[in-house]
A protein has these predicted regions:
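A conserved SF2-helicase RecA2
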Residues: 401-407, 411-437
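A short beta-strand element within the Helicase C-terminal
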Residues: 384-395, 421-424
Length: 437
């Protein structure tokens, strides 16, 4: 279906045609109906093309036509263009957080996270009533982003941070721990600012915007509008009920310190999810689903997790199987275990999927090959990586469309693989608990 929402003016204005798109399609349909009644000798593609007018071809040149897997299988000669690989039943894995005895689990972490107020992200809630008009004038009447008051923006950041914490917990202990430490550092520096003001009341201090946008991975952040306003907001501590704010910050600090302490013992050797990933990789390499194919893609939503996986997985596959690994991310520089190989996106993907990327043309003298690719969603769209037959979602993206897009990197017509496999890692919680998360 064409995405012009029933309003043909939306697309007519963008097309270089003499008639509306509705008229063009009606005319094309009449031509087709006439052509389809001709005898077989005259009912040729050449005759049909001659009957269609210029406007119809202008439309075809101006739009992208999406075809589903079923549509292609039904209407196209797959013997000529190739077939789709057979999708094996997806594998779902739910490893525990750790195999350490009496260690914290997902549900216990969730309960502690529910204790966080995250008021570090809502300083405007503590502005004294007598000072509210001052900040309403400064920020809420700002015309740059009508509808986003500073208080609303802060509340949005607080909620996003809470969701971000939970998704990072699900992604990896390492990523979760990093985020806890970053928020703790922010809280401690703010408490220090308050204490400094409290002890030296003659010193005029201002709090600039404390939201840390970098905490969200750029390839995942779809809430740019939320962060576009208020970057230079300043609230004088003297205009706040800073004692109440400090009390709230201290409570969050104590919870964060407890969480950091409890997850700190979960090092890679005790990270059950990572160890399960090693098992999955080992099984795939020792028992390939397509003869001789060792290639694996591991997707994660977070650059921190991608780096953690690269540090551990690359060593594992190099030591055990003498294979090369690479990592690509939209927010950090790529990495690879291949000596002297440029780790830019195009080079890495060409070495990972040499057939689909025509490596023999681009790098004819290079025999380098990468068998394991760790990636964020910077490559979840638009990349043909059909040399690979095995895709692992190390975490589940909040947007289900991304999961489909990820698998689409290897589920492609003309694939040399007979079978393809999807593996999903889920948090070790019940369905009801997961919905709550």
């Amino acid at each position: 279906a064409l995405a012009y929402e029933g309003n043909t003016d939306l697309i007519d204005d963008k097309l270089n045609t003499t008639r509306s798109i509705d008229d063009i399609f009606k005319s094309a349909q009449r031509v087709f109906n006439t052509w389809s009644k001709w005898n077989p000798a005259d009912r040729t593609t050449e005759n049909l093309l001659r009957m269609l007018d210029f406007d119809f071809f202008e439309v075809l040149d101006s739009v992208t036509i999406a075809r589903s897997r079923k549509h292609i299988q039904k209407y196209y000669d797959t013997a000529e263009i190739g077939t789709f690989p057979t999708r094996l039943k997806p594998i779902s894995l739910r490893p525990p957080l750790t195999n350490l005895k009496q260690a914290i689990n997902y549900n216990e972490i969730f309960e502690l996270l529910m204790l966080l107020s995250l008021t570090i992200y809502t300083p405007s809630h503590f502005i004294l009533p007598s000072k509210m008009d001052k900040y309403a004038e400064l920020y809420e009447d700002n015309k740059v982003n009508i509808g986003f008051t500073q208080a609303n923006r802060e509340q949005g950041i607080r909620r996003l941070t809470a969701i971000n914490l939970m998704k990072r917990m699900e992604s990896s202990v390492y990523s979760f721990n990093l985020t806890l430490k970053r928020i703790l550092e922010l809280i401690e520096s703010t408490i220090h600012s308050i204490d400094t003001y409290d002890k030296k009341s003659s010193v005029k201090l201002e709090l600039t915007d404390i939201s840390n946008v970098d905490e969200f991975d750029s390839e995942d952040q779809n809430d740019e509008e939320l962060f576009a306003f208020g970057k230079k907001v300043k609230i004088e501590i003297g205009d706040m009920d800073y004692k109440s704010w400090r009390d709230s910050l201290v409570k969050d600090r104590d919870v964060l310190e407890l969480l950091i302490l409890m997850v700190g013992d979960i090092t890679p050797e005790y990270d059950s999810k990572l160890q399960e990933l090693f098992r999955v990789i080992k099984n795939k390499l020792e028992h390939p689903i397509n003869e001789g194919n060792k290639k694996i893609i591991i997707f994660t939503a977070f650059a921190d997790t991608a780096g953690y996986l690269y540090d551990n997985v690359s060593k594992f596959v190099k030591d055990k199987f003498h294979l090369n690994t690479a990592m690509v991310s939209g927010s950090v520089e790529g990495r690879t275990t291949v000596p002297k190989l440029h780790s830019d996106l195009n080079t890495v993907l060409t070495c990972f999927s040499p057939i689909s990327k025509d490596k023999y043309l681009l790098m004819p003298d290079d025999k380098t090959e990468i068998d394991l690719l760790i990636a964020t969603d910077c490559i979840s769209e638009g990349q043909n990586l059909q040399d690979c037959d095995y895709l692992i979602n190390y975490d589940i993206h909040w947007n289900p469309v991304r999961i489909i897009q990820r698998f689409g990197r290897i589920d492609r017509i003309g694939s040399k693989n007979t079978y393809i496999q999807l593996v999903n890692f889920w948090a070790d919680v019940t369905l009801d608990d997961y919905i709550d998360l």
